[in-house]
Amino acid sequence: MIIGIAVLTTMIFFSDILFGTSFFWDDISQYVYPMASFGASMTAKGEIPFWNPYMFNGMPFLADFQAQYFYPAHWVFPYFIDPTTGMLKARIIEYVIIFHFVIAQLSMVFLMRGLGASQWGAKRLS
């Protein structure tokens, strides 16, 4: 029931993005998506992306902490490469971001229960 409430509230909050009437913008579309797409496409080809020649005049990719190449949630990205373009499907990044909100809600419930809050109070605070 707790998972259902977390998923339902997240779906309501992000309904515009989940149902395709809106999308994330600014840093997501201009920096995060190109970096994630490059890393995922290189991994799908079986190559380690040490250098990114497409950003600026070229820059280290694997050493850039903002590329988030070793972040566990991004390990699924190579499986969602569009074969026609060779790029990552943009919706996948949005779904991963939204999934983090579900994880945050569930973590808050377990934290509050661990601190002695009632089950109703823990659900209400999350």
Model-identified regions with their sequence ranges:
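Transmembrane-helix signature of polytopic, membrane-embedded enzymes
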Residues: 108-126
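Membrane-interface coil-to-helix junctions
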Residues: 7-108
